[in-house]
């Protein structure tokens, strides 16, 4: 699994989940699953286009990865928007927020995303 820490003007984009029920209302770095035969970078660009309707490019992968259950791991990359404007699409997210480093603790992040916050804060 891959997530995008979308950065702009010293802020990072957080997305509030609408599903599944146990994740609804909590915040994450948007992203999703890497399909068979797909590179993590290609998957991340595809997922952001599907979820937020914009095109991004990977700037750098953050260090580390986090286990999600027994079958998946999460990697997060710093990315920047190269075309379009991120928009919440209700099938995945109902709100987006641009957060300064000092505001990262203001939202209820999903657990797998939390270890990456310090890297984003230091960014």
Predicted regions span which residues?
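Conserved N-terminal beta-strand and adjoining loop/helix that marks the start
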Residues: 1-13, 33
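A structural signal for short, well-ordered beta-strand segments
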Residues: 4, 44, 76-79
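A conserved beta-turn-beta hairpin within the catalytic core of GNAT-like acetyltransferases
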Residues: 21-25
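The catalytic Nudix box helix
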Residues: 29-61, 100
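Active-site-adjacent beta-strand/loop module that shapes the phosphate/pyrophosphate-binding cleft
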Residues: 55-56, 64-87, 95-103, 120
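Charged phosphate-binding loop/patch that engages nucleotide di/tri-phosphates or the phosphate backbone
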Residues: 112-123
């Amino acid at each position: 699994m891959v997530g995008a820490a979308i950065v702009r003007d010293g802020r990072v984009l957080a997305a509030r989940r609408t599903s599944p029920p146990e994740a609804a209302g909590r915040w994450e770095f948007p992203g999703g699953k890497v399909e068979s035969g797909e590179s993590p970078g290609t998957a991340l660009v595809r997922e952001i286009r599907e979820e937020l309707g914009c095109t991004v490019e990977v700037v750098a992968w953050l260090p580390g990865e986090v286990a999600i259950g027994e079958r998946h791991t999460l990697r997060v990359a710093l990315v920047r928007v190269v075309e379009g404007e991120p928009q919440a699409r209700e099938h995945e997210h109902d709100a987006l927020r641009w957060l300064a480093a000092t505001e990262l603790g203001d939202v209820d992040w999903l657990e797998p995303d939390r270890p990456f916050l310090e890297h984003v804060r230091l960014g």
